[in-house]
A protein has these predicted regions:
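DNA polymerase processivity clamps
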Residues: 1-236
Length: 236
């Protein structure tokens, strides 16, 4: 699995360089490299394209790479973004040319944009959405997730699509994260969840739980940066 840390100007080059070469590429922007490095360190490697973006510009850049991957037959995407509005435009009905679900995993904290995403994809047919989140108030989070589920699984809606929302995690305190996660993964959804997806603010929780110091987190970031620079240099 290639772990890539790049700044905004390098992001397009990294996408174009890695997407055709490997189906196991994790790409994320330098804007949130501390967050992304620690998240990447915990994600189970999987054959999917993962993107972490931090603003509209990066979202637009990432959408270009995703659209190319969809056209190439990719069906699974793990999206980490604080501004996902640009992502939604590229999953168009004419891209739904397979009976296999298009799996979309959103790793940011659930908000109104995510609900908008769900409403947008509701019209796109055979789609599966996995929402992962870290919330201070689990009750509020559950309400949002339930509303989201109902909005995309309304049996009375005309031509209701196959659109499943899997609630991955809603935690009252950060200290419960791994116990709760383990319970959920070994539960009824275990066969459907490839790996856990959490929010962009999770890096502090991971660092605390793993006993990592800031210097260790910085080392992860440095190693990731060196990896992509070396990789891109070898493939230039």
């Amino acid at each position: 699995m290639a772990t890539v840390t790049v700044n905004t100007l390098e992001f397009v080059s990294a996408l174009r360089a890695l997407i055709p070469i490997s189906k196991q590429a994790t790409l994320y922007s330098g804007e949130k490299e501390r967050n992304a490095a620690t998240i990447a360190a915990r994600i189970t490697p999987a054959k999917k394209l993962a993107l972490i973006t931090g603003n509209s510009a990066l979202g637009a850049i990432a959408s270009v790479g995703i659209e190319q991957a969809v056209e190439a037959g990719e069906r699974e995407f793990c999206l980490y973004t604080d501004d996902a509005k640009n992502i939604t435009s590229i999953f168009k009905p004419n891209k739904q040319n397979s009976e296999e679900p298009l799996r979309l995993e959103f790793g940011n904290q659930l908000d109104n944009e995510n609900i908008m995403i769900a409403e947008t994809h509701k019209a796109y047919g055979n789609t599966e959405l996995i929402v992962g989140n870290l919330a201070e108030d689990a009750e509020i989070t559950d309400t949002l997730l339930n509303d989201l589920y109902l909005s995309v699984n309304n049996p009375e809606a005309p031509e209701s699509p196959s659109f499943n929302v899997i609630k991955v995690a809603a935690f009252t305190t950060a200290s419960k994260i791994y116990g709760e996660a383990a319970t959920r993964v070994t539960g009824s959804d275990a066969g459907r969840i490839r790996h856990l997806i959490y929010g962009t603010h999770l890096h502090g929780v991971i660092a605390l739980d793993r006993g990592m110091e800031d210097s260790e987190v910085a080392t992860l970031v440095s190693e990731a940066r060196n990896t992509v620079l070396e990789t891109m240099g070898n493939r230039a």
